[in-house]
Curated annotation (Swiss-Prot):
InterPro entries assigned to the protein according to its UniProt record, in alphabetical order: Ribosomal_uS19, Ribosomal_uS19_bac-type, Ribosomal_uS19_CS, Ribosomal_uS19_SF
GO biological-process terms attached to the record: ribosomal small subunit assembly; translation
Role according to the record: Protein S19 forms a complex with S13 that binds strongly to the 16S ribosomal RNA.
Domain of life assignment: Bacteria
UniProt key word tRNA processing: no
Gene Ontology MF term list: rRNA binding; structural constituent of ribosome
Name of the protein: Small ribosomal subunit protein uS19
GO CC list: cytoplasm; small ribosomal subunit
Amino acid sequence: MSRSVWKGPFVDGYLLKKADKSRESGRKEVIKTWSRRSTILPQFVGLTFGVYNGQKHIPVSVSEEMVGHKLGEFAPTRTYYGHGADKKAKRK
């Protein structure tokens, strides 16, 4: 179920403040965040966020196509190594 339209997109307050400060200063530094649940807004385009995936901060450069999605969608939390190979195939 999606979020109600009348509520608007969710963004943590501190993240919005950090993004505004970064825009004003004009420096290209990574904004570290643990807020995977925050929605990407149009004013975030061009900024780089360090989104925490449980182990480290993954750098996510925001583009126009990402607007409306959540930050956590671009920092996977699980690593897929593939299914185990058949033991008989390994021997040959």
